[in-house]
Structure formats: structure tokens, C-alpha cells
Design a protein with these regions (language model features):
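Alpha-helical scaffolding within the catalytic cores
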Residues: 1-4, 53, 57-59, 89-91, ...
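N-terminal binding-site loop/beta-alpha segment at the start of enzyme catalytic domains
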Residues: 1-69, 186, 280-281
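CE4/NodB-like, metal-dependent polysaccharide N-deacetylase domain
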Residues: 7, 85-105, 122-126, 178
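Acidic-and-aromatic substrate-binding clefts and catalytic sites of carbohydrate-active enzymes
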Residues: 22-26, 46-54, 78-83, 109-114, ...
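Short, acidic/polar
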Residues: 23-36, 80-96, 115, 140-142, ...
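A structural motif
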Residues: 40, 98-101, 129, 153
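A short, structured active-site edge motif that brings together acidic residues
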Residues: 66-79, 102-109, 136
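Beta/alpha (TIM)-barrel catalytic core signal, keyed to glycine-rich beta->alpha loops juxtaposed to Asp/Glu
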Residues: 108-281
Length: 281
């Protein structure tokens, strides 16, 4: 596994495994164990996923030492504000039977994220978290937070895929020394991404799948992708991206697919903000 060095010196795997929507406890534990066995070391969960306990059980059962794993969770907005955020992280540690998290993110850029972020800073100083960051913070919110804190976020996890390439986000995250991480690198299969002629053609050129091409494209842009699957053979396939390199021409060809639009929703849409803030997770 290759690694990125975050702005505080912590090393983070360049590819991670996400467990969003894997709610069944036994299935979640199985897929995390399979992912670790396949070679993943970065495991990404969240308070809102409802599977922290299952992920924790898998971590306890694996033979891979804890210090070789990079475990991420995210604080949901119902736990924002200084006190609630701090308590919620301790509760997540207890659920997962962990002494520390490698990374904790604020899940959404709404409500009292400044207060919640101050809680993460204190937990970071106490050694309960090795690195802190945010998720879904588009450039305006990221800059707002970065200019109002003593500890600049180490990571910002946002939607990035060939149809939503986040060029502006990459510029501003790089400017402030924030590592960009990609959720939904495959757009959850939307818009025919796996049968896209351009991506299929590039994959054939390197004898790689569309998924491998997308993950390689992200890695070459300096972005850490979070792949998600419940099939072990696909987990292994998604890690097999370090034996080839996309040409500059192919990188530009993929860049031409950008529609600069989310495959899911816009965090700038008032209706989306109302929906997210109304979720009681």
C-alpha cells in the first residue's frame, strides 16, 4: 500500500474502503474483514451509517495490528456543538472498542460546525484522534473554517468522480494543505459510468476495468478514493491499480467527461440543506 502524508505528518493510505449502506451487522463485519484481508488498511465509517459497532468487531477480530490500520469515522450534525461533538466521539470510540481514531471528520458543513470542530481540536490535542478534518465542505465553507481555526483540516472528503471532478475544490484544498478524499468515485453506478464508452476504451488500452481506471485517475490527481463493494474479488480488483499509469492524454480525455454536477444532490440547494439538517441520525 502507498501512503499520503497529511499536513500534520500522519500517513494515510492512498486508497480506502467505505462501508456506507452496509447496515447488517454480520455482513458489515464480514466485508470489513474481507477488505482488510484483501489489503485495505483505511476503513471509513460514520456515526450516521449505523455500523460503527460492526466495524469495531471486525477490527478486534483481524490479525492485522491496530497500528497498521487507519480508521475513520464522522460526526453527524445532530452531534454538532462543542460538548455534544466531544461526547459523541468518545461514544464512537467505545462502540468500536478503540483507544483512538486515525481520522475524525465533520460529516456536513451545516449548523454549529465551528463548535464541533473545536471539540475535534481538543480531542486531537488529547491524543484521542490522530488527525481531524471535514466532509462535504465545498470551497467556500472550507476556506471559512480554515481561516477561523488554529488547526487546519487534514482531510476533506467530498464527492469526486469523472462526472463531478471538483477542480475548484482541488485547487483550494491544495492551497490550504488539505488532502482531498473522494466518496462515490464510481457515482454509485449512475449515468452509465461503468459502460461509458470513453472509460471502457481507456480500460481496454491498459487491460483494466472501468473501476480501476477511475481509481487510478483519482490517485494520479492526488485524491484518495474510497471504494465500496461487498464482493471480495472486486475489493482485490480495486486495489490492483499500482501496476499501470494513465498517460497525460488519457487523463485529459477523462477530464473532458466532467459535467461539474453532483450525481446525487447539491449542498448549495436550500431544499438539500433542509433535508440533511432534518435527518435525526
Amino acid at each position: 500500500m502507498e501512503y499520503k502524508t497529511l499536513n500534520n505528518g500522519v500517513k494515510m493510505p492512498v486508497v480506502g474502503f467505505g462501508v456506507f449502506q452496509v447496515k447488517d451487522e454480520e455482513e458489515c463485519k464480514r466485508v470489513v474483514l474481507d477488505a482488510i484481508d484483501a489489503g485495505y488498511r483505511l476503513i471509513d465509517t460514520a456515526q450516521s451509517y449505523g455500523n460503527e459497532e460492526a466495524v469495531g468487531k471486525a477490527i478486534q477480530e483481524t490479525n492485522v495490528p491496530r497500528e497498521e490500520l487507519f480508521i475513520t469515522t464522522k460526526v453527524w450534525i445532530s452531534n454538532y456543538g462543542y460538548e455534544k461533538a466531544k461526547v459523541s466521539v468518545e461514544e464512537s470510540l467505545k462502540k468500536m472498542q478503540l483507544d483512538y481514531f486515525d481520522l475524525v471528520l465533520l460529516h456536513q458543513p451545516f449548523k454549529d460546525y465551528h463548535g464541533a470542530y473545536r471539540a475535534l481540536i481538543d480531542l486531537y490535542k488529547e491524543g484521542r484522534i490522530k488527525a481531524i478534518g471535514v466532509s462535504n465542505f465545498y470551497p467556500d465553507r472550507l476556506v471559512d473554517l480554515a481561516l477561523d481555526t488554529e488547526v487546519v483540516p487534514a482531510v476533506n472528503q467530498v464527492e469526486v468522480n469523472p462526472f463531478h471532478q471538483q477542480d475548484t475544490a482541488l485547487i483550494y484544498n491544495t492551497k490550504y494543505g488539505v488532502q482531498l478524499e473522494a466518496w462515490a468515485p464510481f457515482a454509485e453506478g449512475k449515468n452509465g459510468i461503468f459502460t461509458n464508452e470513453t472509460l471502457v476504451e481507456i480500460g481496454n488500452k491498459y487491460n483494466k476495468s472501468v473501476g480501476q481506471v477511475i481509481l487510478r485517475w483519482l490517485v494520479q490527481r492526488g485524491i484518495v478514493p474510497l471504494a465500496k463493494t461487498v464482493r471480495k474479488e472486486r475489493m482485490q480488483e480495486n486495489l490492483n491499480i499500482f501496476d499501470f499509469e494513465l498517460s497525460e492524454e488519457d487523463m485529459q480525455t477523462i477530464a473532458s467527461l466532467n459535467k461539474d454536477t453532483s450525481s446525487f444532490f447539491s449542498h448549495y440547494d436550500p431544499a438539500t440543506v433542509e433535508m440533511i439538517c432534518g435527518l435525526k441520525r
